[in-house]
């Protein structure tokens, strides 16, 4: 929005905006490949002024540099301050710190030029499998392509895929799966069979052939079994992945429980994932808590259009404060329709191009008898694909 005037705008508010100007100036510099030291200095300044989102950004920078111990220091500060993205990353990293410490050790040797061939293979493989960074992994492993080292070939295939060379990438996935049943190649092939052909049985056979207990494979087996309507097996594999603190598997398991009408189990697993920093789990948990509140007093729920669950509202407030626009929109439903908070929350969500927020602002201004603004927001909502309904369609025509 600010384009080339962004720096000028943010500079006006340095030290005057509780770290907001510093935070967004740092983001702007990141997008334009600015000086890393300057970016870190701005984010450090933002944290000192109370902007807790900056902790996550600093942690993310150190993660990309493979400095995980340093990253965890900042992510912990963000977690302790209540920042949910920092919490998620901190908990995710915590499960992998043994691998990450080894990466730090080997990366130091690489930078010093003292790393052995086997250690270089180990480092590249860890960066690929535990950090999910095929670009960095390829830089480390490319010398081993000539010996058909599977992680090196896989990293190359991912880069080809990113360059829209799908056919070449799939040929490599087939090669390394045939070569040694490499689990990442198996996942690539299985996911294509599922998405493209709905061939769940063959996809499952490929995954079984890996004999892998990696959470990626366990969770995807659960997904396949769910699509095959074998819900007991789906639960078994989702649970195996969830037991390893895989948050995606927890969310899938929660969804499975919801479809099976096992709401108590869904609530528990969503709560576990939410406490580990999952925004989507928190959002789903809030829905369940609100539904349970309605069941306690259905007559009141029908009479009062404002949502009632205090627990759900508290969760949505936290998610909204973390910048989640869907939570902002849902949180607005906990206020009477003429309350100023309805306008404030939906404006924040609209700034993130949330189409429901555009519609809600149209309704808000309609109730305020502000024809110009209500029509403006209904028009924007409609232009962005939101169905505003026959009544407001007719209202726009007048």
Feature locations, PLM:
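Terminal, low-structured helical/coil segments at or just beyond the last alpha-helical repeat
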Residues: 375-398
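Single-residue signature of alpha-solenoid repeat helices
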Residues: 6, 39, 71, 102, ...
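Short helix-capping/linker turns of helical repeat alpha-solenoids
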Residues: 16-18, 49-51, 81-84, 113-115, ...
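Residue-level recognition of tetratricopeptide repeat
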Residues: 27, 60, 92, 125, ...
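Residue-level detector of the short coil/turn that links helix A to helix B
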Residues: 33-34, 66, 98, 131-132, ...
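Hydrophobic/aromatic packing residues within the alpha-helices of TPR/SEL1-like helical repeat arrays
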Residues: 10, 43, 75, 106, ...
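Position-specific recognition of the canonical hydrophobic site in helix A of tetratricopeptide repeat
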Residues: 30, 63, 95, 128-129, ...
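Canonical tetratricopeptide repeat
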Residues: 24, 57, 89, 122, ...
């Amino acid at each position: 929005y600010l384009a080339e005037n962004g720096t000028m705008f943010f500079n006006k508010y340095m030290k005057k905006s509780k770290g907001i100007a510093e935070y967004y100036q740092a983001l702007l510099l990141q997008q334009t490949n600015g000086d890393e030291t300057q970016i870190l200095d701005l984010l450090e300044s933002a944290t000192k002024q109370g902007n807790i989102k900056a902790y996550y950004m600093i942690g993310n920078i150190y993660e990309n540099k493979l400095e995980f111990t340093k990253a965890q220091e900042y992510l912990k500060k963000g977690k302790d301050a209540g920042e949910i993205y920092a919490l998620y990353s901190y908990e995710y990293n915590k499960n992998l710190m043994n691998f990450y410490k080894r990466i730090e050790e080997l990366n130091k040797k690489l930078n010093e030029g003292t790393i052995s061939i086997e250690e270089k293979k180990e480092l590249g493989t860890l960066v690929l499998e535990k950090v999910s960074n095929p670009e960095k992994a390829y830089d480390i492993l490319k010398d081993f392509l000539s010996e058909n080292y599977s992680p090196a070939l896989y990293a190359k295939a991912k880069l080809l895929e990113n360059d829209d060379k799908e056919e070449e990438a799939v040929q490599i996935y087939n090669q390394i799966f045939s070569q040694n049943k490499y689990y990442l190649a198996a996942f690539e092939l299985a996911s294509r069979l599922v998405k493209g052909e709905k061939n769940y049985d063959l996809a499952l056979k490929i995954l079984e052939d890996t004999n892998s207990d990696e959470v990626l494979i366990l969770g995807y087996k659960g997904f396949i079994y769910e699509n095959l309507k074998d819900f007991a097996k789906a639960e078994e594999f989702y649970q195996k992945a969830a037991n390893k603190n895989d948050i995606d598997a927890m969310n899938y398991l929660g969804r499975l429980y919801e479809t099976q009408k096992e709401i108590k189990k869904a609530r528990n697993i969503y709560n576990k994932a939410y406490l580990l920093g999952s925004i989507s789990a928190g959002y789903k948990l809030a829905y369940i808590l609100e539904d349970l509140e309605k069941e306690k007093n259905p007559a009141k729920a029908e009479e009062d259009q404002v949502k009632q669950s205090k627990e759900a509202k508290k969760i949505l407030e936290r998610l909204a404060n973390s910048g989640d626009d869907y939570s902002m929109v849902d949180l607005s439903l906990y206020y009477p329709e003429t309350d100023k908070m309805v306008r404030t929350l939906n404006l924040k969500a609209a700034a993130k191009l949330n189409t429901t927020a555009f519609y809600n602002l149209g309704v808000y201004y309609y109730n305020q008898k502000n024809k110009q603004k209500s029509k403006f927001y209904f028009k924007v909502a409609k232009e962005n694909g939101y169905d505003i309904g026959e009544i407001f369609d007719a209202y726009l025509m007048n």
